[in-house]
Amino acid sequence: SEHGNWGMDYRDAVSCENFINEWVEAVERDFNHPAIIGWCPFNETWDYKGRRQYDALIKTVYEYTKEFDHTRPCIDTSGNFHVVTDIYDVHDYRGEFDEFRKSYERLVTHGELYEHVLNDNPGRQKYGGEPVFMSEYGGIKWESDKQYKSWGYGNDVKTEEELLERYKGLTDAIIDNERMLGFCYTQLYDVEQEQNGLYTYD
């Protein structure tokens, strides 16, 4: 279960208070739900509009979550910057699957993770040998209807077949990597400003 917090101002005491109350309520409410396989209180808490990620808050919320539910793994903040986490998750939207595959080969051969957030921020993002989860990938630009403005990563595909080929290449690269524990493709459906799904709302 990932909680909505993107763009939250960590300098605002009211925002923090509201977030913590909502998170505690969600964990206590959903603890016994069989669909919950893990917890993730934050998403992409990189430095935003000059606001540095608030590591102390992330660590505190992680520790509360683990104290309340020690039976499930907890990802502290999805994508970055990890502070303390049970699973090291990655967001990678590179569209060329050969490059995508090669960048994770050292995970199998040497137990080392080579991913852009870690490499661009070695002092802030650290890999400690945790299981690796590709929690966001894809985002392939696909314009099924030219009257709507599409958005996505990589060179846009022209046909459904081309989109499926790229999807398969990226997904196979993850499945074939024995050190990846799972994946979540984003996304199969158009959502709001991200008009790059294979399917539309209707």
Question: Which residue stretches match the model-derived regions?
Answer:
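Substrate-binding clefts and catalytic carboxylate motifs of secreted carbohydrate-active enzymes
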Residues: A35-W39, E63, V84, R101-D202
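Active-site mouth of glycoside hydrolases
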Residues: S1-F97, Q125-G129, K141
